[in-house]
UniProtKB/Swiss-Prot annotation:
Family: Belongs to the 2-oxoacid dehydrogenase family.
Domain of life of the organism encoding this protein: Bacteria
Induction context: Induced by glucose.
Segments of skewed composition (Low complexity): 80-117, 202-231
E.C. no: 2.3.1.12
Quaternary structure and interacting proteins, as annotated: Forms a 24-polypeptide structural core with octahedral symmetry.
GO MF, one example: acetyltransferase activity
Any GO CC annotation of this UniProt entry: pyruvate dehydrogenase complex
InterPro entries according to UniProt: 2-oxoA_DH_lipoyl-BS, 2-oxoacid_DH_actylTfrase, 2-oxoacid_DH_E2_comp, AcTrfase_Pyrv_DH_cplx, Biotin_lipoyl, CAT-like_dom_sf, E3-bd_dom_sf, PSBD
Protein's name according to its UniProt entry: Dihydrolipoyllysine-residue acetyltransferase component of pyruvate dehydrogenase complex
Length: 547
């Protein structure tokens, strides 16, 4: 029987087909990867939900696919008709399955043991569109007693660190992962012995032997069959693959290669069956840097930028090398990419917030009564949301073609949070529809999650504009880097009391420094000046937000 295999739920957005891993006539197993999709956030391999033979392929390299699009047509194995045909052709064979059929009967008495019935598989929950994440900490071990919602492991993706809690109380029987492993949604974390879960567990062992026995028997020969063909691949280990369609690498390796601007077909594979590992990419980058260095002062890197000479700092004194967290590494790569791709200009201005501050202080008691702390941030969020609707170019992104603007009808604003592991930017959605107290509560909650590694990847996506405030630390101004594909970011520094001429005398006024960095391809200087001028007017008299 033929079935159409479609793209499963891949989170928000769509992905480009960068690699086809099968061809018509290939025999595939359940969960075997069919193709690799690359979105603007990650690359992911799409597995086959069933075993069978590839009849035809509906997608090709370069296609853009989304959830529900056709991948291929699969001739599914193991249907009822082939079983009947075997029964007619060889009467002796059906006796074997029948002989196996009573086997589950004794096994039905075995699951009655409460120990086996109470074991649950604890798996990685939905971690959003991040796809994969590295295990950076395992907090339990076999034999430990855990409570519901107690943290089991800490995962770190390219967007955030998060702790995965236990969904139930129980005793850890075995831990299936270790520090350094890369896991995704649905991967097994550990086995947990839970009391009172026997009925649900009994049904699974009873049904599993009958269903799993045949596929298990089929999968092993199938996996063994292609092994000799692929066994030729490790032989030339160290030789780069020149055929881009046959590069074998996981999503994390592809992401690392993109960050470094490395063409995977040029990388020497050292992994099993010719698979490219992270270490292979790192070695390749080091070789290129050494080659550029030995090429003399005129040598340049892959992007045409002369590399910074390598310096042995230890000859000047004692040094210590401290590893950057993955979050810091990815953040640095993203900032570098934005800086190289976006023509930055920064507009500086000041806003008189004397009256606004008086209003904020006057509402302090009301805010505390509502259980929130009213800071300057919610007022900035509200004012910026007003301006994003008034000046829609600031609420847009440059189309990939570079010939159009994509204007957004929603107003989601990110705000930078300083954490021990690096800078995180949670996003508040529909800022224009929320009150100051609602914004204050949501900002406090997101900032707390960011600092405690509870922030999901989805909570940091979809922003139209970003606010980065250093006012609590100090400074008179800075040049924030635009978080592309956004086109602007507002930097806020420390407010100070300054003398301001009112036409008759100098008056003490509380002045807030503003730094608006913008993408000059989308925003011109006059528009940026209008933005900061209007923002100053709104902050000077926040009653104008009601107009």
């Amino acid at each position: 029987m033929s079935e159409l295999i479609r793209v499963p739920d891949i989170g928000n957005g769509e992905g480009e087909v960068i690699e086809l891993l099968v061809k018509p006539g290939d025999k595939v197993e359940a969960d075997q990867s069919l193709l690799t999709l690359e979105s603007d956030k990650a690359s992911m391999e799409i597995p086959s939900p069933k075993a069978g033979v590839v009849k035809s392929i509906k997608a090709k390299v370069g296609d853009t696919l989304k959830e529900g699009d056709e991948i291929l047509e699969l001739e599914v194995e193991g249907g009822e008709q082939p079983a009947e045909a075997k029964a007619e052709a060889a009467p002796a064979q059906p006796e074997a399955p029948k002989a196996e059929a009573p086997a589950p009967a004794p096994s039905e008495s075995k699951p009655a043991a409460p120990a086996a019935a109470s074991v649950q598989d604890i798996k990685v929950p939905d971690i959003g569109s991040a796809g994969k994440a590295n295990v950076i900490e395992v907090m339990v071990k076999a034999g430990d007693t855990v409570e519901a919602d107690q943290s089991l492991i800490t995962l770190e993706s390219d967007k955030a660190s998060m702790e995965i809690p236990s969904p139930a109380s129980g005793v850890v029987e075995s831990v299936s992962i270790k520090v350094g492993d890369e896991v995704g949604t649905g991967d097994l974390i550990l086995k947990l012995k839970v009391e009172g879960a026997a009925p649900a567990a009994e049904e699974q062992p009873a049904a599993a032997p009958a269903q799993a026995a045949a596929p298990a028997a089929e999968q092993k020969p199938a996996a063994a069959a292609p092994a000799p063909a692929k066994a030729d691949t490790p032989a030339p280990v160290g030789a780069p693959s020149r055929d881009g369609a046959k590069v074998h690498a996981g999503p994390a390796v592809r992401m690392l290669a993109r960050e470094f601007g490395v063409e995977l077909s040029e990388v020497k594979a050292s992994g099993p069956k010719g698979r490219i590992l992270k270490e292979d990419v790192q070695v390749f980058v080091k070789e290129q840097l050494q080659r550029a260095k030995s090429g003399g002062a005129g040598a340049t890197g892959g992007a045409g930028i002369p590399p910074i000479p390598e310096v042995d700092f230890s000859k000047f004194g004692e040094v210590e090398e401290v590893a950057m967290t993955r979050l810091m590494q990815v953040g640095a790569a993203n900032l570098h990419r934005s800086w190289l791709n976006v023509p930055h200009v920064t507009q500086f201005d000041q806003s008189d917030i004397t009256d606004m501050e008086a209003f904020r202080v006057a509402q302090k008691a009301a805010a505390e009564k509502a259980g929130v702390k009213l800071t300057v941030l919610p007022i900035l969020l509200k004012a910026c949301a007003h301006l994003l609707k008034e000046l829609p170019d600031f609420n847009s992104s440059l189309a990939p073609s570079g010939k159009a603007l994509i204007r957004k009808k929603y107003v989601h604003i990110g705000f930078a949070v300083d954490t021990p592991d690096g800078l995180l930017v949670p996003v508040i959605r529909d800022v224009d529809r929320k009150s100051l107290l609602q914004l204050a509560a949501e900002a406090a909650d997101l900032a707390d999650k960011a600092r405690n590694k509870k922030l999901s990847a989805d909570a940091m996506q979809g922003a139209c504009f970003t606010i980065s405030s250093l006012g609590h630390i100090g400074g008179t101004g800075f040049t924030p880097i635009v978080n592309a594909p956004e086109v602007a970011i507002l930097g806020v520094s420390k407010a100070t009391m300054q003398p301001v001429w009112d036409g008759k005398a100098f008056q003490p006024r509380l002045m807030l420094p503003l730094s608006l960095s913008y993408d000059h391809r989308v925003i011109n200087g006059a528009a940026a000046a209008r933005f900061t001028k209007r923002l100053g007017e709104l902050l000077a008299d926040i009653r104008t937000l009601l107009l």
